[in-house]
Amino acid sequence: MTNRTRIIFRADGNSQIGLGHVVRSLALAEMLRHDFECVFAIQAPSQELQEQLKKSCDGVIILPVCNHDEERFIHELDAYIAEDVLVVLDGYNFSTAYQQSIKRKGCQLFCIDDIYGYTFVADAILNQAGGVKAEKYKTADYTKLLLGPKYVLLRPPFLEAAKAERSLPTGAVSMFLNLGGADPQNHTLQIAKALKQVQGIEKVEVIVGSAYQHLPELQTWLHHNRKYSLHQNLSAEEMCQLMQSCAIAITSASGVAYEYASVGGLLFVLQTADNQESLYTFLTQNGIAQKYEQIERSIKAGLPTAFEQAVTTQRQYFDGKSDERLMKVFCNMALATGITMREATSNDLMLLFEWANDPEVRKNSFNPNPILLESHTRWLHTKLEDKQAKLYIAEAAGEPAAHIRFEILNGKAIISYLIGSGFRGKGLGHVILQKGVAKLLQQKPELKFVEGLVQQENMASVRAFEKAGFSYGTPDPKFPQAHRFELHPQSIN
């Protein structure tokens, strides 16, 4: 993209709540940063965390400390967002009201979630845990759900590792131990002590993050146990290399488990927080990982076989292409963000003629016959002079993308629209309907009712009207087999 669309990532992280939301948001920023301007908004980050954010993002917005139950919390991004900005939220305090505040600015909104704790009005929701049913979520009609590890948020080294062959590391049998960036309950030390009794492990690589608060206690214990090595604040590259050297890992049921599974190896997981329950269940029930309690039995049964079986299963879920899938989603969202409406003119004659005669358009029209240029010319000139007709061209990045027309009579507008072939399949239908209606209301604020007729087999348009907030009305007697969609003033304003 020449003019990169701005994405504002909003997440918090510290020693109390951990760094999980920040880390996975940064993984997404790493995927998108070359095509988008990525800016991170956060409350009270430590100096170390600020430096980490700057490595992955183009800028950092340090927000004033504000509790989520304060009235001003839902407006904390107001000064930074407009309809040409994408917003990514990752955290449990970004409730429906917070999201609505962003949507009222006209922004495209993307939420990263794993607890489905409230109604979402986001344009897309990502839950990378496997086995999550769409029915768990209460969403707006237009919300797109991205569920499971095919959309996993991995940093670049782990995406590359997922594509590479993985074999059992040679030399001393090493274990990777990481229970999260903060680990407030100090599971790290508890597990490290327990591993002294496990036979067959020659080295233990212990990793903690910048928010870990128990470092002196851990260092004191490790000083007397030489097979343990301590690492802190590793980069993604360093973390990946360390994982590749370890045939075995113990992690929390969090993003780090997905990172190790993308590298490949014998993985054991521990649930260290309530919000890890669904991921813990998915990992252990599908053979991607085993429960921590099974570690001794599994190692005794034979490491080479267990390692190979684990990697084979993990490769079925992690193909290293989640960045490509997510890039496509964000490019479509950016396209929707940039949609503008202008009035059609006589200069659009041939453009509208070509669009109208597109085979796909004719197939879904109530009159499927080809349109002649002479009759099209008369029609356009008549409509442009008609005070009760409004014709708009939707443009994306300055390029004509769609046409939307309204026929107005007695406070009611009948809508008709089409999308150019190069812009189909990008999820733009509902955006064009919404922006077209908004443009019409600016010019005709007295409007009371909008309706549209859609052929039953035209599922793309049916879905677009549903996502745009239209409801099903009584069928039109002239076209009883068609869906009749309607939108009332209270739904519009």
What are these regions, as identified by a protein language model?
Residues 9-16, 24-31, 43-56, 62-141:
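Active-site and donor-binding regions of nucleotide-sugar-utilizing enzymes
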Residues 121-186, 215-216:
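A nucleotide-sugar donor-handling region in carbohydrate enzymes
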Residues 163, 169-245:
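Donor-nucleotide binding loops and adjacent catalytic segments primarily
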Residues 257-300:
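Catalytic binding pocket for nucleotide-activated donors in carbohydrate/polymer assembly enzymes
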Residues 301, 319-338:
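C-terminal alpha-helical cap of glycosyltransferases
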Residues 308-320:
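A short, well-ordered alpha-helix in the C-terminal region of glycosyltransferases
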Residues 338-351, 356, 391, 395-493:
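Acyl-donor (CoA/ACP) binding surface of acyl/acetyltransferases
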